[in-house]
């Protein structure tokens, strides 16, 4: 298998995935990517959630379009300066059109996106995968063997059960686990600003200790995150003082401590 060209363009690639749905994985992936741009990095965001591609909606770029040049290279959508997005959503005639594909078709589509896209210069590639340990994360792991992984969970035990499967999946495929993110750790009261434990707090810490992986951070719930996603606003940019933004930026800073520098330019 020939190495995808993106390996040469993104010294840091990270698969963001989860064991189950509904944990806010796409929102986390989008805001990590935004946070990296706030730290001056050039970032690509690849949406391989083939059956539920939501990143264009979350980032407010649903109405934009991909372009293809004379060399048959796909050019991503520019979300903001330094952030480029590729999503299968841009290839659908209508947002409500379902994709009914089996595994080999999904693998080939992901391979095409990895090899045919002209990202330009990238420092980081953030890959948003669907929940579970199925075809899409497996394809990414096979096509980008140098990819690292972040597992997103919520505090309740049902989510933690599936989180353990996701961690073991990454270990079986020799993906470097950057760590786990506990999303929705608490709810920030919109009236008094105090945290409310609507789920059991500390699930991320338990997984971190039990599985021997770092806890990258615990992200509190904030009603503004929902509003930002619904209206396509970049949350960490629009609400820099939110405790959730501060928690996300702490995760970003931990990722940057592990950053691989770009290779030296060839003479």
Predicted features, each with a name:
Residues 7, 52, 103-111, 134, ...:
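Amphipathic alpha-helical transducer elements in NTP-driven molecular machines
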Residues 12-47, 167:
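Walker A/P-loop phosphate-binding motif and the immediately C-terminal alpha-helix
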Residues 42-44, 48-92, 107, 205:
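Phosphate-binding loop that captures ATP/GTP phosphates
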Residues 123-124, 130-228:
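Conserved catalytic-core segment of NTP-binding enzymes
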Residues 231-244:
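C-terminal boundary of histidine-terminating zinc-finger modules
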């Amino acid at each position: 298998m020939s190495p995808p060209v993106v390996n040469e363009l993104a010294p840091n690639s990270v698969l963001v995935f989860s064991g189950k749905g509904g944990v806010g994985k796409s929102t986390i992936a989008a805001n990590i990517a935004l946070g990296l741009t706030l730290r001056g990095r050039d970032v690509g965001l690849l949406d391989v959630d083939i059956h539920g591609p939501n990143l264009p909606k979350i980032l407010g770029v649903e109405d934009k379009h991909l372009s293809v040049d004379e060399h048959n290279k796909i050019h991503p959508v520019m979300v903001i300066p330094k952030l480029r997005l590729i999503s299968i959503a841009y290839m659908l005639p209508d947002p409500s059109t379902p994709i009914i594909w089996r595994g080999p078709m999904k693998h080939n589509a992901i391979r095409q996106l990895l090899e045919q896209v002209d990202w330009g210069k990238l420092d980081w590639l953030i890959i948003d995968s669907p929940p579970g340990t199925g075809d899409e994360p497996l394809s990414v792991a096979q096509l980008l063997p140098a990819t690292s992984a972040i597992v997103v969970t919520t505090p309740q035990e049902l989510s933690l059960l599936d989180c353990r499967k996701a961690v073991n999946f990454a270990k079986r495929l020799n993906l470097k686990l950057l760590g786990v993110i506990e999303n929705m750790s608490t709810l920030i009261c919109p009236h008094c600003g105090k945290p409310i434990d609507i789920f059991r707090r500390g699930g991320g810490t338990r997984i971190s200790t039990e599985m021997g992986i770092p806890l990258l951070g615990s992200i509190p719930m904030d009603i503004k995150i929902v509003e930002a996603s619904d209206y396509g606003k970049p949350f960490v940019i629009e609400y820099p003082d939110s405790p959730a933004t501060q928690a996300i930026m702490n995760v970003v800073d931990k990722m940057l401590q592990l950053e691989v520098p770009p290779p030296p330019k060839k003479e």
